[in-house]
Regions:
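Ribonuclease/tRNase effector modules and their secretory precursors
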Residues: 1-105
Length: 105
């Protein structure tokens, strides 16, 4: 699992502001990573570092889309959110149907 062994999150003014601009608080975003998330590589945006896309639910049950990378400092690994936004209902419906198909196998 990509997030296995992660120590915590790496925040600064830039990524905090970018997420909050889309209405996603630090607490909401972090809570989503404490639940089950679908995580995919994002090769289209991985020029300088490997990036990932995560889709999941916050502790309030809202569906969230997160772009992030992993940063390594002094032997520890941190999730560095790049951007996050709440998903539109059409996206939520598509995601839930896709998950249901996987579960039916």
């Amino acid at each position: 699992m990509i997030t296995q062994g992660v120590t915590g999150f790496e925040w600064d003014e830039g990524n905090r502001d970018k997420c909050q601009k889309h209405g996603v608080s630090v607490d909401a975003l972090e809570s989503a990573f404490h639940k089950t998330m679908a995580i995919f590589p994002d090769p289209a945006h991985s020029q300088d570092e490997e990036r990932f896309i995560a889709i999941g639910k916050t502790s309030e049950g809202r569906s969230v889309f997160v772009a992030f990378t992993l940063r390594h400092h002094e032997g520890e690994t941190f999730i560095r959110p790049i951007s996050a936004r709440y998903m539109h209902q059409k996206e939520v419906d598509y995601y839930e149907k896709a998950i249901a198909k996987i579960d039916d196998r």
